[in-house]
Amino acid sequence: MNKRMIGFVIGRLLLLEAMLMVLPLGVSFIYGESLKYKGAYFGVIMLLIAMGLALSFKSPENMSIQGREGFVIVALSWILMSAFGALPFVITKEIPSFIDAFFETVSGFTTTGSSIIPDLSVISRSNLFWRSFTHLVGGMGVLVLVLAIFPKHSPGSVHVMKAEVPGPTFGKLVSKLSATARVLYKIYLVMTGIMIVLLMLGGLDWFESSLLAFGTAGTGGFGARNGSILPYNSAYVDIVLAVGMLVFGVNFNIYYFILIGKVKEALSNEELKYYLIIVGAAVALIFINISATYKSMGHALRDIFFTVSSVITTTGFSTADFGKWPVFSQTVLLLLMFFGACAGSTAGGLKISRVIMMAKMFVAEIKQMISPNRVVSIKYEHKPLDSKVKKGVANYFIVYIGIFTVLLLVVSMTTDDFLTAFSAVAATFNNIGPGLGKVGPAFSFADMTDVSKIFLSFGMLAGRLELFPMLILFAPETWKIK
């Protein structure tokens, strides 16, 4: 275990977080907030700089990162970044409990959007900005950002990126890893900027436009007002956000291929096709189920499209309380919570690509059982599926079910409502945000017990980091020096 290298990378990350916190500090000056808020951010920035410099002042002699170091770096980085990111909420006493503040910040960085704040109107502008800004930072990955900003990287940095970028497979877009990170972030930030402009054209000010754009880009769902998107009462805003969420749920590699002229290759992506088919099917099924309850078909279609877009991309914005929709519609949405959007996007969930692969593996197994001597080839993207990938997908599903079961058992001990317990785990583990029952769009996670919040925070981190980085922290072999 190269502990010096782990400390060095984490030190760089803490310095990066200090840089990022300058933005909410600036917001506190712009809106003339009291010294309490300016002091909170300034104090945390100084603490981060001190710790960051202490850990990364001198480069380690051995700069190599192996697989386990990559997992440990990713897991510890996200935990520490969330812990320090929670401090402004605690210091300003807007979220007095550290467990609550940690839950809120983990929810932000993991782009989950589950909240313990029942009333956003009492939260300062600087804290609202930081809360939503964590979505933008966590969406593409905090360590991907480190690789993009600090070009010097070790030969094993690919292990870090593999552990943080969502999906069953990973590939570099260009020859250098740091260049790949910069390409991804450029596309990501330009698209976010376009979202801000489009929302401002809809009559929103720069502050609310930025917060909603951050929530859309990171597919996180934190907003600026109580009631999520409903208070805006704007068809234009609804459509911009609904389309935006779908766009950010697409693999960012596809946008890169479009930019370099490989449009046909990009649009023939198998996962993209299934993603759009699933969205269309879900909208149609729910429309058939609830359209009669709306006075306007257009309004019904708008709410349904927005909700499906929000749930499948695990964003969590809402224009309607889908907790009051018929059971069939809620069941469709619950399935979408598990599917998630595309690999290589900012969305959570299992990812469409994994669901496709698992379905093909299941069908192949059935065919093999019917005709034992038959050779069944499983293809994905017109190529035979590698045995290593198949094993990885199967293992992921097994571990996913195991963690989900443990989280459900723990949370169910603290509530007498199974729907609330099940959807709370599904909503946090899949990085969605609101669930059903007492954690639905009209409620918050404030009434959950501290034990539940701690376990759900673990679930959010595990879901965002593809399970294994969080689990490897508990393996004794991880910490042995070889």
Segments from the language model and where they lie:
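Membrane-proximal intracellular helices of multi-pass ion channels
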Residues: 1-482
